[in-house]
A protein has these predicted regions:
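Absolute protein N-terminus
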Residues: 1, 20-21
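Hydrophobic helical h-region of N-terminal Sec-dependent signal peptides
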Residues: 9-13
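Secondary-structure junction/capping motif
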Residues: 3, 35, 95, 114-119
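N-terminal secretory/targeting leader peptides
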Residues: 21-110, 125-318
Length: 318
């Protein structure tokens, strides 16, 4: 009788033991391994793996050589990979709301306090089968980088490389736009296929674009966003302890975003040293340029997402 009770107790223990086993999550990046985004992530992953032994581990599969950048979002949605290091601009084909992340005028830490993060996570759950773990790039404006100067904020006659981030704004300024993956931009500049591109204040040296860039238009606009997103089904399959551990690690990673302020200052000085000249307008024109960027983008977002667009604007704006 005692043997039967022992076997029953052991059988009851098996599911709990199986659930407590260490889980490894597969991660893929839309950005190359030499970018600051992936270098920062590598530090995060090493810390998580050291503290998560026996509980949770991350396995970095690779960047664009492993998967095309614009396919990462769908790979996360469908569970081909567990976590994506990517930007919403690269998976707007899944849901238009992904492009609204560039319009945040509040830091990620404040969005966690005012309900903005919860709104994003709810939308990502519903429309993309994703969990929005953390934003790992912040305080980083976008700019237009050019191979030739402009005297005013009019891009008529220019061919500019874009992602969905800049499409509507650059078109509103008269540009002809060409969408490519980051890895194709250098060749496009070299061959004269494009006259410039949109990119954050940082990162152009990671791709050697500075070699073909002559000007940066001021002021910057929007706020560069790179985030960690996870497949919702995979998230639900973790134990409560594993979800809590991953969430705490992600929030701690996000809390380091202040470091982008100094990094961006250093990158600006580095661009100047490389001979990239800033094109500045008078104060009134600069304000109009900046405001128009947001007006155009929010108009497009609310048209594409009449339910969530206004809610996001309310929580994202100062």
């Amino acid at each position: 009788m005692r043997s039967i009770r022992s076997l029953a107790a052991f059988a009851a223990f098996l599911p709990a033991a199986a659930m407590a086993q260490e889980v490894t999550l597969r991660v893929v990046s839309s950005f190359a391994e030499n970018t600051q985004y992936v270098r920062n992530f590598d530090g995060f992953m090493k810390k998580l793996n050291a503290e998560g032994k026996g509980n949770l581990q991350l396995n970095f599969i690779g960047g664009p050589k492993a998967m095309p950048p614009f396919e990462v979002g769908n790979a996360v949605r469908t569970g081909v990979v567990d976590i994506g290091l990517t930007t919403g601009a690269f998976y707007t084909n899944i849901m238009p709301e992904a492009d609204a992340l560039k319009l945040t005028q509040l830091p990620a830490t404040e969005l966690r306090r005012n309900g903005g993060h919860d709104l994003v996570n709810r939308i990502w759950n519903e429309k993309a089968n994703m969990v929005y773990l953390a934003r790992i790039v912040d305080y980083s404006p976008f700019h237009a980088y050019l191979t030739k100067p402009v005297a005013k904020p009019d891009f008529t006659g220019l061919k500019l490389r874009i992602t969905p981030v800049y499409r509507e704004f650059f078109q509103a300024l008269g540009a002809t736009v060409v969408q490519t993956a980051p890895g194709e931009v250098y060749t496009a500049l070299e061959r004269g296929v494009v006259d410039g591109y949109g990119w954050p204040i940082h990162g152009i040296f990671d791709f050697n674009w500075h070699e073909k860039t002559r000007h940066r238009v001021e002021p910057g606009f929007y706020n560069a966003e790179v985030s960690l997103v996870m497949n919702l089904d995979r998230w639900k399959g973790l134990t409560a302890a594993q979800r809590d551990f991953l969430s705490r690690q992600a929030v701690a990673f996000e809390a380091q975003n202040n470091s982008w302020k100094k990094y961006n200052e250093d990158e600006t000085r580095r661009q100047q040293a490389a001979g990239i000249q800033a094109i500045s307008f008078d104060a009134a024109t600069a304000r109009q340029f900046h405001d128009r960027a947001y007006e155009v983008a929010w108009a497009g977002m609310i048209k594409a997402s009449p339910v969530y667009g206004p809610q996001m604007r309310k929580l994202f704006s100062r």
